Amino acid sequence: MQLNLVCVGERMPSWVNEGYEEYARRLPRECALMLREIAPGKRTRNCDIQRILADEGQRMLAAVGGNAHIVTLDVGGKDWSTRELAEVLARWLREGRDIALLVGGPDGLSDACRQRAAESWSLSRMTFPHPLVRVIVAEQLYRAWTLLNNHPYHR
């Protein structure tokens, strides 16, 4: 199984890349976390946001392939505790399918992404900067993995 974090946005600050990599590299091969960046649509003062969202969504879905188990990161999703996320990760590992975690851009996710999703995960009721979401997701997935493997990281 491979975890694919599919995010709208490129050229992140170094602290984002370093934070993400710190946790992604700790995960073992059977639970590898890979980042797939999608270029954001060009936003201007009079742009058609729905068209941009649809285009970003189409490119996100194309990046994950047809057989992936899609999970959107969305404020309206389930707010799993760390232990609940560990149980979800254990289920994903048992099922063996690749997982695609979709993080939208500044205007969120397209309807097509939401419709294709098998699950939706909310990190918080608060809104986080999209670059920070990458780091939080990587850390939480690593923490969930350590719980499943009785590693002392999660205490």
UniProtKB/Swiss-Prot annotation:
CC terms in the record's Gene Ontology section: cytoplasm
Reactions this protein catalyses: pseudouridine(1915) in 23S rRNA + S-adenosyl-L-methionine = N(3)-methylpseudouridine(1915) in 23S rRNA + S-adenosyl-L-homocysteine + H(+)
Keywords annotated in UniProt: Cytoplasm, Methyltransferase, rRNA processing, S-adenosyl-L-methionine, Transferase
Localization in the cell: Cytoplasm
Similarity section: Belongs to the RNA methyltransferase RlmH family.
Function statement: Specifically methylates the pseudouridine at position 1915 (m3Psi1915) in 23S rRNA.
Name by which UniProt lists this protein: Ribosomal RNA large subunit methyltransferase H
Organism: Methylococcus capsulatus (strain ATCC 33009 / NCIMB 11132 / Bath)
The encoding gene: rlmH
